[in-house]
Amino acid sequence: MKPKTQREVKGGLFLISETRPEQVFTPEDFNEEQLMMKEAVIEFVDREVWPNKERFEKKDYALTESLMKKAGELGFLSIPVPENYGGMGMGFVSTMLVCDYISGATGSLSTAFGAHTGIGILPILLYGTEAQKQAYLPKLASGEWFGSYCLTEPGAGSDANSGKTKAVLSKAGTHYEITGQKMWISNAGFASLFIVFARIENDKNITGFIVPLEENNGIELGEEENKLGI
């Protein structure tokens, strides 16, 4: 009799599992460390974000990049990243505290922040190899690099798995060559690392690839879309 194996679910578990009472938290449950983080992010938003709200909505991407770097210096980008990868390892509640206050100020900065700390960092944190985590997470956690998540295509949005971008193993077998087009990619204009989804030959599902921005990797960026400053 073969032993039963259960696949580990990484990310999105809240979508398929029941919420337990011990998982529920309220502001009254915040500990001293979380309250300190709350005060720090409120001060950052009041000083740096609110006074510049109109500039964000008018496509001032240089300002967005500048404040993202400041957020990295203050540790706001590294909260969910474990300490051994250059992060603060403060957990879910502290992460949500920071996201809550940053997202309440302007959709432009909150989108850049969420794209970096969420779909930019988490794919590597949850699914990357140990070597990939050591190589990329410290740079993303500090704000030295910004991440971008390249999923949507001109003909693939809600049905993301229908994307046409292809990944073909090189003749030497050392790397994959990716060909395709992506669109509406948050942070693409100032990202140093892209999580690019492509299909390997006839695979049923698409695969995520870590693609650093380098001169010889063939990435071409199109013109920025005017989407309410996002």
Where are these regions (language model features)?
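Amphipathic, small/basic residue-rich leader segments at the start of a protein or domain
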Residues: 1-112, 132-135, 139
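Buried hydrophobic positions in well-ordered alpha/beta secondary-structure cores of metabolic enzymes
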Residues: 34, 45, 75, 82, ...
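Cytochrome P450 C-terminal beta-domain/meander region
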Residues: 70, 159-179
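N-terminal glycine-rich flavin-associated loop
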Residues: 111-131, 157-160, 169
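A short, Trp-centered hydrophobic/proline-enriched beta-strand micro-motif
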Residues: 143-151
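A generic structural motif
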Residues: 152-154, 168, 197-201
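A short core secondary-structure module
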Residues: 174-223
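Short, intrinsically disordered, charge-balanced linker/junction segments flanking boundaries
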Residues: 227-230
